[in-house]
Design a protein with these regions (language model features):
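Short, surface-exposed beta-strand/loop "edge" segments at domain boundaries and coil↔beta transitions
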Residues: 23-27, 138-144, 175-179
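Short secondary-structure junctions
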Residues: 1, 71-75, 158-163
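Non-cytosolic head/periplasmic domains of membrane-anchored proteins
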Residues: 40-125
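Short, solvent-exposed polar/charged micro-motifs at secondary-structure junctions
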Residues: 8-15, 91-92, 175-185
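Extracytoplasmic/luminal low-complexity segments enriched in Pro/Gly and acidic/polar residues
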Residues: 145-222
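Exposed beta-strand-loop-beta-strand "reactive/processing" segments of non-cytosolic proteins
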Residues: 1-31
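Mature extracytoplasmic domains of secretory-pathway proteins
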Residues: 107, 119-168
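A short, surface-exposed beta-strand/turn
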Residues: 25-46
Length: 222
């Protein structure tokens, strides 16, 4: 047992268990003020959640070497800057649920992960790595979108950090008061394999339309 804390939020004690032999074996146990057992989070060990979080963290650290680099030619220093990488790993029940619409088809199945297994993070990145990039730029155009997307692909290729797809938003910089206008280009799940110069602007225009249709569908479902 690593530590016990008291939560004023729920009025309970939480004991945090750290396994000395399992990198995915950490969990917590909750007790009432009278010492009665309430619940535990051991399911996160058994269902692959802990393993997924470990892999996600390792991939995030890889992508951060580029996206948090002070030398990045795009502003990543503002409080509203959004640039990160993630692995798309989800429970099978969510992947199979027809009412869940925000899980990409290329997602890895959390239930299939092996406890404590040392995975090749770059290999997983090539299968399910997802970049989320919000870029501030004075010019909002399909041509600028293509140029910047090619630039990011080049940076990740040179660093040998694979990804499968990117979400990309091109928007105007905010004012000194932190305000922004509504003009932007927004693309969801643009595949790495489609980021090449020949015909890129055409593919981007199609992706813009598909992304707009996706959000329109979500609005209709509200």
């Amino acid at each position: 047992m690593e530590r016990i804390t008291y939560s004023f939020k729920d009025g309970r004690y939480h004991a945090f268990m750290v396994s000395p032999t399992s990198i995915d074996g950490d969990f917590s146990v909750c007790f009432s003020m009278l010492g009665e057992y309430c619940y535990d989070t051991y399911d996160s060990v058994l269902d692959g959640w802990n393993t997924a979080q470990r892999l996600e963290s390792e991939y995030r650290k890889l992508t951060d070497t580029i996206l948090n680099d002070p030398a990045l030619p795009y502003d990543n220093t503002q409080v509203y800057s959004i640039m990160f990488g993630e692995l798309e790993i989800h429970p099978k029940e969510f992947i199979d649920d027809p009412n869940v619409h925000d899980i990409p088809e290329y997602s890895l199945v959390q239930d299939n992960l092996e406890l404590n297994k040392i995975y090749d993070i770059k290999e997983l990145g090539a299968q399910a790595g997802h970049l989320i990039l919000y870029v501030d730029n004075e010019v909002i155009s399909v041509e600028e979108t293509a140029r910047i997307m090619l630039d990011f692909r080049s940076m990740f290729d040179e660093a040998d950090i694979p990804f499968y797809a990117m979400d990309f938003v091109l928007r105007h910089p905010r004012t000194e008061e932190g305000q922004s206008d509504d003009e932007e280009i927004r693309i969801n799940d643009f595949l790495y394999q489609d980021i090449y110069e020949d015909g890129l602007t055409d593919r981007i225009e199609i992706a813009i339309e598909e992304t707009a249709a996706y959000y329109a569908m979500l609005d209709q479902m509200k």
